[in-house]
């Protein structure tokens, strides 16, 4: 007899992509309508800008389906506007919004997207846009491909995170790509992430590139801390990815709970001191794939910064977000788009 998913925490978050994908191409600024095809290999030149020079951007979205009602797609308009920012930063043609939403909806409508390689009520959606031109030199691509992949997601309570404070490498510098969701933002992470895992940590804590003192992000998650009576999160700048989960948490905290949310720089020194004097009571991360997760510890060279284990604010915010996504609470801010599953 198989255990319910919640009791199998050793299973990975994802296994593989759903069997079908959506695809559209852009020639000279004209996009084809989205087509459906078997998820798999595409004919692509190895010199394509997307492969050779990292001209590639993506999104990560989420949808819920209870198996009966229409599927609930979360904040797709926000994902589209971030995709526009990312494409523009890399000088790429942007898929029109209608095409983008249609391709995502097609994926959700297909019941097999939710059932293979394993059945799930939550679908992770990965739109990708990449340059197809195969120039010898790094020139922005005129021919561009847009694909929408999906993958069923496993949800169950996960262990609090242990973060490795990265004092040598940096994620993003001022004027760089940190605020755009580009593949290039991930290329530099493999080595630091591997080192963090070697040190027994789950993820990298990224600090600012200039001083390595200010907290920016945790791997691919935004960061929140409860300090005194305030929910504090690093202020957005071009070195920080503007997470949609981050934004949703801020809205929930402010508008539903009247909690004061402050966006400002947070240093590691302040965090260590605020834990010491008892004013820092909670720390957690926010992202689409991992949703909201607590931080247990930051390993910073020889010292360990340990966080309190009780997380009442985090628990409340996570429940609120989950209830909206699942249709168990009012969609007060119009975050949900319903898509019938055929
Ligand atoms: C995608 C991403 C996030 C989280 O953003 P969400 O919109 O909440 O999923 C945070 N940091 C980085 C670097 C990311 O790529």
Question: Which residues make up each language-model segment?
Answer:
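Extended, Lys/Arg-enriched charged tracts that mediate electrostatic binding to polyanionic substrates
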Residues: 5, 116-130
């Amino acid at each position: 007899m198989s255990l319910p998913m919640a009791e199998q925490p050793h299973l990975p978050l994802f296994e593989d992509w759903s069997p079908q994908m959506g695809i559209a191409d852009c020639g000279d600024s004209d996009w084809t309508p989205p087509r459906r095809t078997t998820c798999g290999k595409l004919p692509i030149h190895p010199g394509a800008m997307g492969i050779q020079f990292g001209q590639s951007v993506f999104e990560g979205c989420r949808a819920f389906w209870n198996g009966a009602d229409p599927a609930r797609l979360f904040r797709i308009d926000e994902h589209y506007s971030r995709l526009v920012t990312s494409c523009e930063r890399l000088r790429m043609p942007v898929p029109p919004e209608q095409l983008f939403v249609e391709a995502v909806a097609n994926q959700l409508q297909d019941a097999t997207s939710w059932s293979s390689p394993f059945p799930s009520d939550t679908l992770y959606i990965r739109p990708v846009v990449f340059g197809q031109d195969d120039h010898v030199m790094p020139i922005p691509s005129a021919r561009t491909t847009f694909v929408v992949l999906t993958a069923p997601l496993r949800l169950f309570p996960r262990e609090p995170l242990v973060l490795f404070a990265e004092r040598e490498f940096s994620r993003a510098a001022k004027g760089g790509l940190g605020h755009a969701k580009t593949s290039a933002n991930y290329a530099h992470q493999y080595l630091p992430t591997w080192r963090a895992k070697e040190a027994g940590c789950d993820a990298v804590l990224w600090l600012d590139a200039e001083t390595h003192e200010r907290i920016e992000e945790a791997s691919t998650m935004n960061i929140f801390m409860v300090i005194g009576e305030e929910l504090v999160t690093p202020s957005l700048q071009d070195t920080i990815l503007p997470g949609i989960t981050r934004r949703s948490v801020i809205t929930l905290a402010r508008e539903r709970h009247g909690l004061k949310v402050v966006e400002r720089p947070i240093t590691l020194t302040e965090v260590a001191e605020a834990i010491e004097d008892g004013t820092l009571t909670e720390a957690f991360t926010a992202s689409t794939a991992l949703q909201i997760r607590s931080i247990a510890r930051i390993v910073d060279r020889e010292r360990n910064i340990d966080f309190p284990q009780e997380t009442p604010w985090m628990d409340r915010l996570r429940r609120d977000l989950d209830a909206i996504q699942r249709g168990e609470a009012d969609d007060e801010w119009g975050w949900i788009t319903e898509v019938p599953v055929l």
